[in-house]
């Protein structure tokens, strides 16, 4: 029964005949809650997309990126005649 109620419902009713005790949700609050849910879903989707990659491929820290850029720049420098 707990799965039937969204997370912003304050307390589920004790009897089926009782009404839900919910504060009125303004359009701004509804938009905020929707944005949070969409952001969480996007994070889960991104994690699923990167799950098959190794950590060394999927995660590059700033230090790794600086090292890659330095090596790439050194390889492209012309040799002195």
From Swiss-Prot:
Disruption phenotype: RNAi-mediated knockdown is largely embryonic lethal. Fertilized eggs show a metaphase-to-anaphase transition defective (Mat) phenotype. Arrest occurs at meiosis I at the one-cell stage of embryogenesis. GO terms for cellular component: anaphase-promoting complex. Keywords: Cell cycle, Cell division, Developmental protein, Meiosis, Mitosis, Ubl conjugation pathway. Pathway: Protein modification; protein ubiquitination. The keyword Cell cycle applies. One of its GO terms (biological process) is meiotic cell cycle. The keyword Metal-binding does not apply. Expressed in germ cells. The APC/C is probably composed of at least 12 subunits: apc-2, apc-10, apc-11, cdc-26, emb-1, emb-27, emb-30, mat-1, mat-2, mat-3, such-1 and gfi-3. Probable component of the anaphase promoting complex/cyclosome (APC/C), a cell cycle-regulated E3 ubiquitin ligase that controls progression through mitosis and the G1 phase of the cell cycle. The APC/C complex acts by mediating ubiquitination and subsequent degradation of target proteins. Developmental role in early embryogenesis and the metaphase to anaphase transition in meiosis and mitosis. May be required for germline proliferation. Required for male tail development and hermaphrodite vulva formation. This is Anaphase-promoting complex subunit emb-1. It comes from Caenorhabditis elegans.
């Amino acid at each position: 029964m707990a799965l039937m109620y969204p997370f912003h419902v304050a307390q589920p009713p004790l009897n089926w005949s009782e009404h839900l005790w919910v504060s009125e949700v303004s359009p701004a609050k509804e938009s905020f809650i929707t944005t949070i849910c969409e952001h969480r879903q996007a994070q889960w989707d991104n994690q699923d997309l990167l799950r098959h990659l190794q950590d060394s491929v999927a995660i590059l820290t700033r230090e790794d990126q600086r090292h890659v850029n330095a090596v790439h720049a050194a390889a492209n420098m012309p040799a002195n005649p």
